[in-house]
Design a protein with these regions (language model features):
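Conserved class I S-adenosyl-L-methionine
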Residues: 95-110, 127-130
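Conserved beta-strand signature within the Rossmann-like core of class I S-adenosyl-L-methionine
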Residues: 228-236
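Conserved AdoMet
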Residues: 2-101, 219, 235
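Residue-level signal for inorganic ion chemistry
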Residues: 82, 201, 226
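Conserved SAM-binding loop of SAM-dependent methyltransferases across substrates and taxa
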Residues: 107-124
Length: 242
């Protein structure tokens, strides 16, 4: 029987491989309690039985758990820095075929933005971006490549006009030439192996939800995944302290 939040964390780890101990407890517990109430369950035990036996409800749980906030060209000033300083420097040091990893890529907005920015500097055939997330639903959406107009609100027109096809009044579909630049795969930052010899790792606005110990462990693994002289690109509110 799942009696309390401690039992619930153990149950979720066994069922999904997601370790809730790595997330800030007050924040995560509040989100989970809200989800349980929304699904009209009386407590942890009832909800655990439901997600164990209902694949759709389990998918909803994982999707809700892995906080997905993403849009194209989010925080334009940072993208400008990437475009004008970081990428040219990496290309100068390592050549045009950079190994890039978009970690916790959500619905694909970030790796596709990377591909479009990089396409101004190197041939499309030389662009290969490895993109991972723990959530199957967002990965499927990323592979589909269809986005709302709101997701593209910060994207410069030069990219929108060149790489998107409008679908009705509200949606846009990304071009196949950009889709081919990105390889999506399911991966858990807390337990799965990391790609090695990366020139650039992008992981933005994700680790703010993790405990300090979990963040430290992930940053160490990121460091081990980078080549000497490589770059870790994080969100504008995130700090890495040695």
């Amino acid at each position: 029987m799942v009696k309390d939040y401690e039992d619930f964390k153990k149950f979720v780890l066994g069922l999904t491989g997601i370790d809730l101990n790595a997330y800030k407890e007050k924040q995560m517990k509040r989100r989970i309690d809200t989800l349980i109430a929304r699904n009209k369950h009386t407590g942890y035990d009832s909800y655990c039985n439901a997600i164990k036996n209902d694949a759709q409800m389990l998918d909803e749980f994982v999707n809700y758990l892995t906080i997905n906030v993403s849009e194209f060209y989010r925080n334009p000033a940072l993208w400008k820095k990437l475009d004008e300083i970081i990428l040219p420097d990496l290309i100068k040091k390592f050549g045009p075929r950079l190994k890039i990893w978009s970690a916790a890529c959500s619905t694909g907005d970030e790796p596709y933005s990377l591909a479009m920015v990089l396409a101004k500097k190197v041939p499309l055939k030389d662009i290969k971006i490895y993109a991972t997330d723990i959530d199957d639903q967002v990965l499927e959406k990323a592979k589909d490549g269809v986005y709302s107009a709101n997701s593209l609100k910060g994207l410069p027109d030069e990219y929108k006009n060149k790489y998107f096809e409008k679908m009705g009044d509200k949606y846009y579909k990304i071009s196949d030439e950009i889709k081919k630049c990105v390889e999506f795969k399911k991966s858990n930052l807390l337990k799965d192996s990391y790609p090695q010899s990366c020139h650039l790792i992008v992981c933005r606005n994700v680790l703010i939800y993790f405990t300090e110990d979990a963040k430290l462990e992930i940053y160490k693994k990121f460091n081990d995944s980078l080549v000497k002289g490589g770059c870790l690109f994080v969100g504008n509110t995130e700090q890495i302290i040695n």
